[in-house]
Amino acid sequence: MATVKKLREKLLRGSRLSSQEVRKILQDLGYVLARQKGSHEQWIAGGRTFTLACHGKEVPHYILDALKKLVEEKIDG
């Protein structure tokens, strides 16, 4: 199992992530799974919502781009 730090580095390098790896990063950022309908999960933290669509093995690039912004915000403070 990869640590969250390694998963963040993998994300920032531009590598593909599985939905399970994305969930670990979201939990580390303080997000909590609020609800799920089908393959779409709604994660909430501090009034912000993040939707994770799990349609296949790898998460689509546009979701990874949004997650990358969240990780960079946490790093910058």
Language model feature labels by segment:
Residues M1-R35, I44-G77:
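Basic nucleic-acid-binding interfaces
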Residues G38-S39:
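Ligand-recognition elements built from short beta-strands and adjacent flexible loops
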